[in-house]
Structure formats: C-alpha cells, structure tokens
C-alpha cells in the first residue's frame, strides 16, 4: 500500500499546471463507443479512473493506442461484446456511462453495477427513466444492469428529470445521440463537463443543442465519424490547489484553466480573505492575512460544487469564527470528519449541515482517506498542519488527481510517498 508522508506548516509558492477534467474524461471515453471510426482524445488526465475506463473499452474489443501520456486513440469499429467485465466495471461509478453509449449504438448493454465513492446512495433511477422513455427495457440481474430494445435502435422522446442529475443528463445524452428522431432533456444539469461531452459528440457529427442550459435538444443521427478532441481543464483539481494555498498561505499561479468555470469557487475564497487575480487562462492565488468565516452550500452548477465541499471545509477549519457548510447534493458526505478531528479540527455535523469552529492551527496525525475528495482535503489539512501526517488509502486520491505529489512538491510542499508491504490496495466496489 502507498501512503503519503507530509511535513506540514510550509506555505506554497510557484506554478501548477492543471490536467484534463476527470469528470469529462470518464464520460468522453465511453462515448467513443458511439463512434464508428477512430477518436483521438487529447488532454486526458493520467489517473487511475481513466486507466480503468480504457481497460474496460479494451475488454469490449475496442482498439486502444496510446500516443503519448495525455493522448489516446480509440477505435470502436470492432466491438465484439456489449457485456462489460464485472471485475473492472464494478470498481468505478462512471462505468454506468457505458450503458448509454452501448445502448445508443447497439441497442443493448450489460454493465456491472458500478462502484465509486461511498458518501451516500447513488441511485440511477433518473438514468433508467430516460432509457425507458427512449424505448429500452432495463433490469438488474446477477449484479448487472441489462438494457435492451426490441428494434435495436432507441427512439427520441421528451424526458423530464425529477432531480438535477449530472450522471443522468450525460448518460441520456449519449443514449439519444444515435436514436431515431428528436430527444429533449428538461431539468438537465449544466456542469462544464456536460458541455464538454456535448462538444465532443458534436465534433464527431452529433446534433446536440442547449448543453449548459436546463433544456438539451438532440436530433438523432445514423452514425458518428471519427475525429480529434481535447478535454477541458479540471475545475475541481484547480479548486483543490486554490484551497491548498488558502489553507497554507503563500502564492501560486494556477495554469491551464477556464476562469469562468472557477467563478463559484473563486467567489467563496475571496469572501474568506483570499486574493485571486484572474488572467486569460490562469489564476494568481494569494493568501497572506487571516482567513474569515463563511457559509457554504453545495449546489448544482453554477453553484458551489459538491466535489469541492471537503476541501473548502478544510480551509474553514482554520478560519476565524464559526462557519456553516450545507451539503445539499449527496447524503453522508461528511464521513471524513472524524479524520479531521484527529488533527484538531472542531466540527459538528447535524444531518446535512456541518458547524465548524475555526482553530488557530491543525496538528499532524495518522489519517486515512475514505473517498476521492475527502482524501484531497486530508492532503490540504496535512499541508497546513503543524508536524507530520501520514495519509493512508491514497489510491482513492489517485483516482482523480494526476501526479498530485509531484505537483505539490513543485510548490514547495514537503510530501512524499512510501510503500508499506503486505497491505492491500484493492478498491472495494462501493468505495472511491
């Protein structure tokens, strides 16, 4: 098992390059199955979820050619199966995007029940509602989600999502892109990676309008051609480094970003006393004075992202006064709080609300990551804390952060990896 050893208490200085967006990549890679030709995908992040996604496609019969560290070519012209590997697909939540892509192209899909981060029930009822409206029959049998059509092709429909769901919006979009006729998705999610998926599909010949609004209109096409596409920068990775310098103090230049995507995060950090200077594709982030209390509520985009909730909570642990964090997107996303308490944080949780009494400093401690974003938050806490911290279960962090140790070292952080023999790193299906 790999662990991180962090000597905290050092401010961060320097530049950090942001990788391609994880949440876009894990949808765009399955979407390549909808294309009859070869897709060249650039700016792919080097993270374990991407590696797993490519392995799943390869198991289905897709040709995978690695051009360089951040570019792959996917040839889905010779797919030999619509049934995913149980052992591979169960390890990640995003494997459910294979239902939409396989169903959209072949009219059938058998996908193992997905895993992912264990911070609440991850229902796929809105996905199923959309697939059913498009003419599919969906059942769960033997640990697999089986979806099929009688005619082999879906038919366009009007679909209203009962709740704003990023996953359902993207999955239905993929299923509908090659359906017969027109599809309208109402109450759609608006996240940047939804727009990125739509742009990818449109670049391959799809006809999708309205991505980024609450109504998406899709005119089905018979086929998609091959082409090249570059994934957008990762909003959450950028926000994580911004939160890190907010917690430790210092000044960093966050490079390769889309500033508009960062507005919801930037606004809250500025409220807390962090200075942020926006440039064309960079943000200069500086924190020299004391942190101020703030109230944060997670919301669908363009609101404050749930994937940044643990990281902003870390910063608020060091702010003067009492702060409130309300988690309105997922249940049980405060599982990391006990680990923070080991480091001296004062946090009380009542349902969806965390009450945070700021402390002058955190202290190093042995802690373990319980999911991807909580793990990143623990890294931030360890960087800001006095003394040494040991973070275990870091494989969850590496699901979504490319070269996090190297990037932090480049900012002056004292962080290193150590290998502990005899301990398993296997990700359980329900944990991320």
Predicted regions and their residues:
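Short, structured segments at the rim of ligand-binding sites
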Residues: 1-432
């Amino acid at each position: 098992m790999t662990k991180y050893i962090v000597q905290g208490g050092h401010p961060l200085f320097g530049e950090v390059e942001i990788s391609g967006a994880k949440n876009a990549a894990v949808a765009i890679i399955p979407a390549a199955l909808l294309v009859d030709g070869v897709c060249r995908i650039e700016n792919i992040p080097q993270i374990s979820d991407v590696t797993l996604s490519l392995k799943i496609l390869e198991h289905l019969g897709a040709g995978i050619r690695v051009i360089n560290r951040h570019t792959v070519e996917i040839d889905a012209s010779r797919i030999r199966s619509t049934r995913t590997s149980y052992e591979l697909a169960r390890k990640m939540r995003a494997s459910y995007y294979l239902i939409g892509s396989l169903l959209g192209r072949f009219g059938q899909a058998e996908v193992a029940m997905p895993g992912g981060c264990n911070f609440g029930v991850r229902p796929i009822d809105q996905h199923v509602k959309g697939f059913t409206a498009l003419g599919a029959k969906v059942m769960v049998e033997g640990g697999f989600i089986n979806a099929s059509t009688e005619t082999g092709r879906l038919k366009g429909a009007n679909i209203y999502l009962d709740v704003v769901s990023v996953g359902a919006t993207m999955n239905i979009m993929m299923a509908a892109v090659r359906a017969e006729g027109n599809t309208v998705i109402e109450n759609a999610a608006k996240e940047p990676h939804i727009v990125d998926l739509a742009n990818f599909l449109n670049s391959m010949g799809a006809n999708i309008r309205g991505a980024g609004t609450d109504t998406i209109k899709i005119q089905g096409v018979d086929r998609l051609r091959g082409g090249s596409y570059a994934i957008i920068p990762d909003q959450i990775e950028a926000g994580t480094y911004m939160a890190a310098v907010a917690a430790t103090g210092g000044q960093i230049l966050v490079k390769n970003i889309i500033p508009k995507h960062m507005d919801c995060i930037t606004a809250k950090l500025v409220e807390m006393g962090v200075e942020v200077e926006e440039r064309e594709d960079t943000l200069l982030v500086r924190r020299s004075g004391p942190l101020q209390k703030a109230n944060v509520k997670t919301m669908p985009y363009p609101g404050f992202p749930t994937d940044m909730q643990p990281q902003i909570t870390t910063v608020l642990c060091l702010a003067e006064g009492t702060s409130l964090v309300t988690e309105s997107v997922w249940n049980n996303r405060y599982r990391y709080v006990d680990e923070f308490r080991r480091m001296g944080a004062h946090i009380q949780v009542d349902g969806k609300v965390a009450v945070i009494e700021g402390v002058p400093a955190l202290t190093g401690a042995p802690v373990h990551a319980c999911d991807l974003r909580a793990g990143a938050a623990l890294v931030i806490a360890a960087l800001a804390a006095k003394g040494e911290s040991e973070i275990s279960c870091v494989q969850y962090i590496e699901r979504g952060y490319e070269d996090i140790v190297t990037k932090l070292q480049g900012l002056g952080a004292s962080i290193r990896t150590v290998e502990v023999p005899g301990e398993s790193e296997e990700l359980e299906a329900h944990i991320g």
